[in-house]
Amino acid sequence: MGLSASAPAASTVQTSTPAASDHQTAAPTSGCPMHEGKVKGCPVSAEPSDSTCGSKTNSVPAHQERAYEYVQCPITGAKAANKENLDPSNLMPPPNQTPAPDQPFPLSTVREESSIPRADSDKKWVYPSEQMFWNAMLRKGWKWKDEDISQKDMYNIIRIHNQNNEQAWKEILKWEALHAAECPCGPSLIRFGGKAKEYSPRARIRSWMGYELPFDRHDWIINRCGTEVRYVIDYYDGGEVNQDYQFTILDVRPALDSLSAVWDRMKVAWWRWTS
């Protein structure tokens, strides 16, 4: 999923987790016992889509195209041979899974499946691996220094990143419940983008009132049974990381770019005011 790397996430990671050496690169297996009842492979959701639930988009991000080749089977994934991670077209790892020059320690290339439906298929979005996240930070200008980030820190950062996205989707589903009648199949995610320094009007108003600015912002575009809807997500520092890898306070709401979104915001504001 998103490759946005926020400085607060790296600096506040202090949770007690299994050592990163216990979470090594694993390759996909040909038959996962947990998923054999649905499909051969590990793990892919193969339920047919409902043709009445909106149109699909054909624009698939490059890092999602072959993502399921790197989703680890929870039971048998660790037993697979590393050679299965190679791209059969050139017998090389995909570029975004390649260790960076002078990288101080190895990182896992295993990717975790999210609970977020992809609008272009019957599959779910897949989160980046530790190696992909490291490479993304380097592309954004970050440089590793001694004792800056450890192997264990990268393990924790990925868990925090994934948990943030799962929580954001849960908040979106709460808003989308207002439209359950018109879209009974539920929403799916089309695309998303980071806008860390493009503060939303709501965030700026809060700042003028004395509150801190968010350390990150994402815009998520969802498919509501054929209608594109944009959500704004502001990320605020919530303090110490807990055992569930949560430290971020999320402010999730539909963007005020349609009459439907304005009406939703007004209804929810009224309910909160009168409850």
Swiss-Prot record:
Key words, A-Z: Heme, Iron, Lipoprotein, Lyase, Membrane, Metal-binding, Mitochondrion, Mitochondrion inner membrane, Myristate, Repeat
InterPro entries to which the protein is assigned, alphabetical: Holocyt_c/c1_synthase (IPR000511)
Pro residues composition bias: residue spans: 91-102
HRM repeats: 31-36, 41-46
Compositional bias segments (type: Polar residues): 9-28, 48-59
Compartments, as annotated in UniProt: Mitochondrion inner membrane; Membrane
EC number: 4.4.1.17
One GO cellular component term noted in the UniProt record for this chain: mitochondrial inner membrane
Reaction catalysed by this enzyme: holo-[cytochrome c] = apo-[cytochrome c] + heme b
Region Disordered: start-end pairs: 1-59, 83-102
Gene Ontology molecular function, alphabetical: holocytochrome-c synthase activity; metal ion binding
Topology relative to the membrane: Lipid-anchor
Class of enzymatic activity (EC top level): lyase
Record's function text: Lyase that catalyzes the covalent linking of the heme group to the cytochrome C apoprotein to produce the mature functional cytochrome.
Annotated PANTHER family: CYTOCHROME C1 HEME LYASE, HOLOCYTOCHROME C-TYPE SYNTHASE
Similarity field: Belongs to the cytochrome c-type heme lyase family.
Protein name per UniProt: Holocytochrome c-type synthase
Organism annotation: Bos taurus
